[in-house]
Amino acid sequence: MSDESATFRAHAQVLSGAVLVVAVGELDLVGAPRLLAALPDQGTTPVVLDLASVGFMDSSGLRSLLEARQACIDAGRPFALSRPSEQVLRVLELVDLSSEFEVVERPVS
């Protein structure tokens, strides 16, 4: 793990009828719980996860994306990725899961 992992952050904001969660840093064993903690736990507003600034993702990060998606499905709220980085796309394609995630444009304020 690099120093960037220790500075992973994710924050949520409401934009255009969706909750936008912006993730920055390495989505790994340290970052994955931080990502999940940033997700809203109530409501039915769609969740859009902006991954443009994720420079690395390992299996822990992949698991957090799957957990976030499932939590949204269970709550009846739409879930989508926005601007996934090359590194994120590479992992999703490697494990043949890219088609499991809807990819949308980033909501605007």
Q: Which stretches of residues belong to each language-model region?
A:
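STAS-like cytosolic regulatory interaction modules
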Residues: 1-56, 66-109
